Amino acid sequence: METKMTGTNGSVDSIVFDKPTVEDGADMWELVKNSTLDLNSSYKYIMMCEFFAETCVVAKENDELVGFVTAFIPPEKQDTVFVWQVGVDTSQRGKGLASRLLNALLERDVCENVLYLEATITPSNEASQALFKKLAQKRETEVTVSECFTEDLFPDDEHEEELTFRIGPFTK
């Protein structure tokens, strides 16, 4: 399901959005390792590519991974897609790729019945907060922020609380 996206100036850009394969897992891990994002095990990225490919998106330029979204639809919330992580290569930052990745996810057939998108974000992660608020604004819907995981739940002392950002409902 390769999708070439049209750039803001009307030209077709060279970024292709697709479902990931297990081979993409290592590249996702490497991208996160070289960023400020929380690095999960390499197994997590490979597993997401294998078992949740329908709800994950990779962005490639010249066959090189430049961004991704890992997400899933929780079994008890079939109207919600939960975004675990959004990663964008430094070469693509500030170009709207994260927004395009989220929109590519929401346009997938698997998200046909999705009315909400959720993600957890730390209070200090202003870039992610802005990304999800912008998504809500562009889709003309609401953002609700609520407490999710408090600091005391995390075994390491450096982890901030995680807030749930719930965007929706979406209209089709």
Curated annotation (Swiss-Prot):
Its EC number is 2.3.1.178. The keyword Transferase applies. GO terms for molecular function: diaminobutyrate acetyltransferase activity. InterPro entries: Acyl_CoA_acyltransferase, Ectoine_EctA, GNAT_dom. Pathway: Amine and polyamine biosynthesis; ectoine biosynthesis; L-ectoine from L-aspartate 4-semialdehyde: step 2/3. CDD domains: NAT_SF (cd04301). Disulfide bonds: none annotated. One of its GO terms (biological process) is ectoine biosynthetic process. Residues 15-166 form the N-acetyltransferase domain. Keywords: Acyltransferase, Transferase. It is an enzyme of class 2 (transferase). Belongs to the acetyltransferase family. EctA subfamily. This is L-2,4-diaminobutyric acid acetyltransferase. It comes from Marinococcus halophilus. The gene is ectA.
